[in-house]
């Protein structure tokens, strides 16, 4: 590592090792590092042809018509017939196209006259359309939706011209032991979020990467997502080989997720400026080139219709300025009274307890009641 990073950029950040937030007080215990296979691995045979990648962009014209631009990358035999269709929520085909496969990338566009629009569940119906590509034995589908999201400099949101006040939470880890994604567990969390009237969730830059199934579930439910890139609370190497890795990561995330109507914005990461101000106030913001040059270039090139936000929090005279941009409510973790309500609170902390079974095994009966309130937090300080 170059000498200029010494004492500033942690080795784990310079090596670009993915780890979740188990390393400090923000992360849930126990402190474990995953290893081995924790998600499905598949082997596909391209016979005679297979779809290596499908990316979709959707937008609304000034007249209110919908456009779906599709990019297909094939492997296998060229000149194989394929068909693309777009079905509405009732299964009716509203647009289609066909062609023959070719090596490299192919682009095509579908138009829909006055499509039903996608809304967050608190303000309307989250109408989704299904895009399907078929060729021989191959069939791949993607959920898409049509909506216009406008976000002002003061983080005021309008969806399809309608002002929408955002209420939400940050997503933590589903399983601290296996790191495996469990659809039924995530469905329960999303149920609870909606019971709490949340219409936005933040995919935290230090949390786990989530699969396609999660984004489709948010599409169907009408839950908006603030999507961080996976940087968090650290300074980062700006060497060219590292910048190339960050560029590849961003391109992969956008190509595989940008078609989801639930994603409201891309954010450069979690607390990069805040980490510098708290930990190394006199040092350069190493990693700023990633969030100010690399990520915005990728977003402008691959997803120009969606807002890019540099880092959370940022926007004021200092990173966590509650009067401008977004802010993280660290003082709320200790329930400080009289705190002025911030402008846009994108992260907040609350203390939770373990399950009753765990507490009953590890604590005395006296500790489980009101006079032992402090013991609860001392045994398990974590955030939800």
Enumerate the language-model features and the residues they cover.
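Secreted/periplasmic carbohydrate-active enzymes, especially glycoside hydrolases
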Residues: 1-201, 220, 327
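Active-site mouth of glycoside hydrolases
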Residues: 6-13, 22, 31, 151-158, ...
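Substrate-binding clefts and catalytic carboxylate motifs of secreted carbohydrate-active enzymes
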Residues: 33-36, 266, 297-299, 334-384
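Short, acidic Gly/Pro/Ser/Thr-rich loop/turn segments
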Residues: 77, 273, 351-353
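Acidic, His- and aromatic-enriched active-site or binding-groove loops in soluble protein domains
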Residues: 227-232, 327-339
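Short secondary-structure boundary/capping segments
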Residues: 280-285, 323, 359-363
């Amino acid at each position: 590592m170059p000498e200029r990073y010494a004492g500033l950029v942690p080795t784990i950040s310079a090596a670009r090792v993915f780890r979740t937030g188990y390393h400090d007080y923000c992360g849930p215990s126990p402190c474990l590092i995953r290893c081995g296979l924790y998600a499905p691995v598949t082997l596909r045979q391209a016979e005679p042809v297979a779809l290596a990648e499908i990316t979709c962009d959707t937008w609304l014209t000034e007249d209110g018509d919908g456009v779906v631009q599709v990019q297909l990358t094939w492997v296998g035999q060229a000149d194989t017939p394929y068909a693309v269709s777009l079905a509405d929520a009732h299964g009716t085909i509203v647009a289609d196209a066909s062609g023959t496969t070719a090596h490299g990338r192919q682009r095509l566009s579908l138009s829909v006259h006055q499509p039903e629009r996608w809304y967050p569940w608190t303000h309307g119906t989250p109408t989704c359309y299904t895009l399907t590509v078929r060729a021989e034995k191959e069939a791949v589908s993607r959920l898409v939706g049509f909506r216009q999201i406008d976000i002002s400099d003061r983080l005021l949101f309008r969806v399809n011209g309608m002002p929408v006040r955002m209420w939400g939470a940050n997503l933590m880890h589903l399983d601290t032991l296996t790191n495996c994604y469990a659809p039924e567990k995530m469905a329960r969390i999303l149920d609870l979020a909606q019971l709490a009237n949340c219409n936005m969730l933040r995919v935290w830059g230090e949390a786990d990467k989530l699969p396609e199934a999660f984004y489709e579930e948010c599409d169907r439910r009408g839950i908006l997502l603030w999507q961080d890139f996976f940087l968090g609370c650290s300074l980062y190497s700006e060497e060219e080989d590292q910048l190339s890795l960050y560029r590849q990561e961003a391109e992969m995330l956008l190509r595989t997720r940008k078609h989801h109507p639930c994603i409201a914005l891309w954010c450069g990461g979690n607390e990069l400026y805040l980490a510098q101000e708290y930990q190394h106030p006199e040092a350069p913001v190493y990693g700023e080139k990633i969030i100010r040059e690399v990520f915005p270039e990728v977003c402008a090139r691959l997803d120009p219709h969606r807002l890019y936000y540099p880092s959370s929090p940022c926007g004021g005279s200092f990173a966590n300025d509650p009067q401008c941009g977004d802010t993280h409510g660290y003082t709320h973790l200790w329930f400080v009274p009289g705190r002025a309500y911030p402008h846009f609170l994108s992260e907040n902390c609350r203390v939770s307890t373990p399950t009753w079974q765990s507490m009953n095994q590890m604590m005395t009966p006296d500790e489980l009641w009101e006079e032992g309130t402090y013991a609860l937090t001392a045994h398990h300080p974590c955030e939800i």
